[in-house]
Curated annotation (Swiss-Prot):
Protein name per Swiss-Prot or TrEMBL: tRNA (guanine-N(7)-)-methyltransferase
Active site (catalytic residues): 143
Family named by the database record: Belongs to the class I-like SAM-binding methyltransferase superfamily. TrmB family.
EC number: 2.1.1.33
GO cellular-component term (any): tRNA methyltransferase complex
Native species: Nitrosococcus oceani (strain ATCC 19707 / BCRC 17464 / JCM 30415 / NCIMB 11848 / C-107)
InterPro entries (alphabetical): SAM-dependent_MTases_sf, tRNA_(Gua-N-7)_MeTrfase_Trmb, tRNA_methyltr_TrmB_bact
Listed transmembrane segments: none
Gene3D superfamilies named among the record's database cross-references: Vaccinia Virus protein VP39
Entry function: Catalyzes the formation of N(7)-methylguanine at position 46 (m7G46) in tRNA.
Molecular function GO labels: tRNA (guanine(46)-N7)-methyltransferase activity
Keywords noted in UniProt: Methyltransferase, S-adenosyl-L-methionine, Transferase, tRNA processing
Encoding gene per record: trmB
Length: 236
């Protein structure tokens, strides 16, 4: 018998995302990536049920837990998991080629402190993660949707920050990075209006975030980078 608790039993209701922040298309998968999804998913992947996940059972320990939303090919997750084996890392991604790439690397390196979820972060946060269960959340280079008419598709909106507030432990943190100044300004505006978060540091490149190949290419083209870190209030 399942002992999971539904949203309704937690006194919450499911709030569908008003509009998605991603386009459901993905590049071609290599044969190795397809094979990884078939054979390595049971080891590193998390299949979602109807209630919140038991993260202690999934990782077989109690540890600091960090969530990365939209991890791409998993480069930053891998670097952080290597550097901090005492931490557990969750990654959410909608694109299967990136997931397949990460699974292959996990097997090759023998890392056991990463688990992967395939799905929409909005739904995963609402349905699968207990309140509060995360010590930190990171979102690196989310789609900026640069055209003004598409700004409503940007992930960082007041309703999404409300959701994060429930999932991040008091005293935990929220770290974003973007190479679009306009998006950085929107993020600051949204978070500044939220009582649950306080901005922590300046906006230069963070030494606490791995520098990825994607970021390096952008900087070679003259793109700036805005790192924004916020602390989850202990009083809200």
């Amino acid at each position: 018998m399942s002992n999971s608790i539904t949203l309704e039993e937690r006194g919450e209701s499911f709030q569908p995302r008003p509009i998605t922040s991603f386009v459901r298309r993905e590049g071609r998968m290599t044969p190795a990536q397809k094979k990884a999804l078939e054979h390595l998913w049971p080891r590193y992947g998390i299949d979602l049920g109807t209630g919140p996940l038991n993260l202690a059972a999934i990782f077989n320990r109690q540890a600091e837990r960090i969530l990365e939303i939209g991890f791409g090919n998993g480069e930053s997750l891998l670097q952080q998991a290597r550097a901090a084996p005492e931490r557990d890392f969750l990654g959410i991604e909608v694109y299967r080629p990136g997931i397949g790439h990460l699974l292959l690397r996990l097997k090759a390196e023998g890392l056991e402190n990463i688990r992967v979820i395939h799905g929409d972060a909005w739904e995963v946060l609402q349905r699968a993660l207990p309140n509060p269960s995360l010590d930190g959340v990171q979102i690196f280079f989310p789609d900026p949707w640069p055209k003004k008419r598409h700004h409503k598709r940007r992930l960082i909106q007041p309703s999404f920050v409300d959701l994060l507030e429930r999932k991040i432990k008091p005293g935990g943190w929220f770290h974003l990075a973007t190479d679009w100044q306009d998006y950085a300004e929107q993020i600051k505006a949204v978070l500044s209006q939220h009582a649950g978060f306080n901005q922590l540091t300046n906006e230069g490149q963070s030494t606490q975030r791995p520098r990825t190949k994607f970021e390096a290419r952008g900087q070679q083209q003259g793109h700036g980078v805005w790192d924004l870190r916020f602390k989850r209030s202990v009083d809200s």
